[in-house]
Amino acid sequence: MKISEIREMSAQEITGKLTELKKEFFNLRFQHGVGQLENTAILPSIRKDIARLMTVCREMNLNIS
């Protein structure tokens, strides 16, 4: 997910996507701990997407463009 795509989203869409990614990350971490996750490279990718969403959300709160 690109930062430009995130900036085009509304605050509600960002919050919804953030919740969705956090749930997915939790499930993937659990699978990784149990040893069922085959593609472990997806974990850092999701973590970075969560960080991007949180950054844009914070920018919106501070009215930074």
Swiss-Prot record:
<dbReference type="InterPro" id="IPR050063">
    <property type="entry name" value="Ribosomal_protein_uL29"/>
</dbReference>
<comment type="similarity">
    <text>Belongs to the universal ribosomal protein uL29 family.</text>
</comment>
<dbReference type="InterPro" id="IPR001854">
    <property type="entry name" value="Ribosomal_uL29"/>
</dbReference>
<dbReference type="InterPro" id="IPR036049">
    <property type="entry name" value="Ribosomal_uL29_sf"/>
</dbReference>
<dbReference type="GO" id="GO:0006412">
    <property type="term" value="P:translation"/>
</dbReference>
<protein>
    <recommendedName>
        <fullName>Large ribosomal subunit protein uL29</fullName>
    </recommendedName>
</protein>
<keyword id="KW-0689">Ribosomal protein</keyword>
<dbReference type="GO" id="GO:0003735">
    <property type="term" value="F:structural constituent of ribosome"/>
</dbReference>
<dbReference type="GO" id="GO:0022625">
    <property type="term" value="C:cytosolic large ribosomal subunit"/>
</dbReference>
<keyword id="KW-0687">Ribonucleoprotein</keyword>
<dbReference type="Pfam" id="PF00831">
    <property type="entry name" value="Ribosomal_L29"/>
</dbReference>
